[in-house]
Amino acid sequence: MTFTLRLLVLCTVYSYVISQCDDNGVIYTNGDKWIRNNHFLVTCRDGNIQTLKCVTDSGHLLEVGSKSYVENGYEYMCAREVTDNLNTNTCPTFADFSDDIFKDRFAICCISRRFKGCVDANGDIVKSGFFVIGNKSLKYCRIQANQLQARIEPKGCFNGTEKDDVNDEELHIKKYAVWREGDIEYRCGDDGVHIQRCFPPELKKKAIWAGTAWIQEDGQVKTCGKIN
């Protein structure tokens, strides 16, 4: 009986431990719910972190797989990522330096079967350091010493041109920063620089949210920001 009781206690403790979730050092128990990365309502299920809903900047909850939702000129979509498997064994047997394979902006060398760098907006490979992708979104490419692990870190936005030095920190903008240039107000978001509001002279500088369209007295149709 004693042996059975100890075994039961051991199994109970073991089951409790594996049902926990570790999110960047914070431990959650099975069934706990919390907001992750400011935009995801998640829960802990049997040791795995699962997304329940997406969260907008104002706190509105979106169902996974629901239609797009517009809030303050921003369009939100809550969808599960579809992952494509990639294997270095697909590289040619006699590979050369032109035989690179790519996965989610990571470049992998087929000769060494190691990470080579990250791919910027122009399709160039950055071996290490800052680089820019679409909408002036600033990233940092970090390749581990053994080149078997790589990470792309979000660093905000880059308020410069292709001729400017991407390492110039005076041109780096922190995430969620808002600034105005002329009649346009910009915001550095998750996907780079976007127009947030317009202050058109024809509307007496009244603030207009991005995604808004209006007809002027002369019949011209104007929009604030790009509407896809």
Curated annotation (Swiss-Prot):
Function, as annotated, reads: Required for the directional control of distal tip cell migration during gonadogenesis, probably by recruiting fibulin fbl-1 to the gonad basement membrane.
User: What species is this protein from?
Assistant: Caenorhabditis elegans
Q: Name one GO cellular component term.
A: basement membrane
Report the gene name.
mig-18
Signal peptide: which range, if any? Answer: 1-19
Arranged from A to Z, the UniProt key words for this protein are: Basement membrane, Developmental protein, Extracellular matrix, Glycoprotein, Secreted, Signal
Name of the molecule in the record: Abnormal cell migration protein 18
Pfam families found in the cross-reference section = Fn1_2
Which domain of life does the protein's organism represent? Eukaryota
Show the PANTHER family listed in the entry.
Answer: ABNORMAL CELL MIGRATION PROTEIN 18 (PTHR35572:SF3), PROTEIN CBG04538-RELATED (PTHR35572)
Glycosylation site residues: 135, 159
Answer yes or no on keyword Glycoprotein: yes
| Tissue specificity | Expressed in body wall muscle.
Which cysteines does the record link by disulfide bonds?
none
Asked if the Swiss-Prot or TrEMBL record annotates the protein with the keyword Thylakoid, the reply is no
Q: Where in the cell is it found?
A: Secreted, Extracellular space, Extracellular matrix, Basement membrane
InterPro entries, alphabetically?
Mig-18-like, Mig18_Fn1
